[in-house]
UniProtKB/Swiss-Prot annotation:
Database matches in Gene3D superfamilies: Phosphorylase Kinase, domain 1 (3.30.200.20), Transferase(Phosphotransferase) domain 1 (1.10.510.10)
EC number(s) on file: 2.7.11.22, 2.7.11.23
Induction statement: By gibberellic acid (GA3) and submergence.
Domain Protein kinase: 19-299
Family named by the database record: Belongs to the protein kinase superfamily. CMGC Ser/Thr protein kinase family. CDC2/CDKX subfamily.
Protein name: Cyclin-dependent kinase D-1
GO molecular function: ATP binding; cyclin-dependent protein serine/threonine kinase activity; protein serine kinase activity; RNA polymerase II CTD heptapeptide repeat kinase activity
Amino acid sequence: MASGDGGDDAGVKRVADRYLKREVLGEGTYGVVFKADDTKTGNTVAIKKIRLGKYKEGVNFTALREIKLLKELKDSNIIELIDAFPYKGNLHLVFEFMETDLEAVIRDRNIVLSPADTKSYIQMMLKGLAFCHKKWVLHRDMKPNNLLIGADGQLKLADFGLARIFGSPERNFTHQVFARWYRAPELLFGTKQYGSAVDIWAAGCIFAELLLRRPFLQGSSDIDQLGKIFAAFGTPKSSQWPDMVYLPDYVEYQFVSAPPLRSLFPMASDDALDLLSRMFTYDPKARITAQQALEHRYFLSVPAPTKPSQLPRPPPKGDSGNNKIPDLNLQDGPVVLSPPRKLRRVTAHEGMEVHMHRADRTEEHPSGARHMDDMSSQSSRIPMSVDVGAIFGTRPAPRPTLNSADKSRLKRKLDMDPEFGYTE
């Protein structure tokens, strides 16, 4: 990889000139992603241009972490980092170009996913996770738009900016990772000591999202997110999760019994439901691992996973079609009944009881910070594999990301490697 060491500006410029930038693919807090042509190989690549900013902001450390980890993570289900070089005050990361992502597949109403298609996507996701965990790497930002899909249909884990080496039981990490809808309950309860089980919970949420064609648990706050989880799987008992009551931000919730998993995913196979239940196990110590999940009978039973090259994919960008997805989740969260800084007992809001959506008003699938638009008529609904109105209500919430407050906290508290000059 190009480094520009020794003040070799001409050498760095030659590396930069190798790539001919085309259109912008996306823009984030720290930089821009371009589509580009590699004049040396003739391949199309994606270049992430990162604004390095001031040293104290820590942006460059996040990029260095991603570079370091991706140099070690060479696998067919993990995005390939081709090159990295500084140029004109920015750090450029060159990745293999991927046509789309799993979120686009989920949102595209013109795509019909068969059970074999879903199985294929989940298998590739778990293969990537299993490789990361084998190398003692936590991803910590699993969500559909970080699962990229290439022209050959291959799914690959991407965006390792929050990834972390794990393994030491005494090592503390920040719990402000993952977008909220994909956070495991132990993270929502404030644990700072965790392992690969947090990635598995998020993978379970993605599995559920593929089955439902919409985000599964859409909390508007951490407490509300826990309420959504407990409404779906029941309030955990100490016998299920002995360490729960010792977590830093533990909140006692009113007991709610778990509805049958079949009622949430009526179209899923028995094997799929069994795997989901193991991925959504409350106690992280008992939660299934990625390798164990790959060996689960779900992947051995018929139908066999679809070959990646035969998977349906969304149309090119700009030809979005009708990709609006109904969303039946309730934004209101459970109510905290007792004062702060004491053991808080939380009960489910009465709005989490039966509260069905009007037939002529469905909401657009949330993405980023966009507001939701009403769909035109009942005929524009897509078939849902679960009637969740009785559990989750009706009002949509915007898809969460790591917001500015989260990022500010991460800048102060990210547990960086000592070699990057950043310690906690």
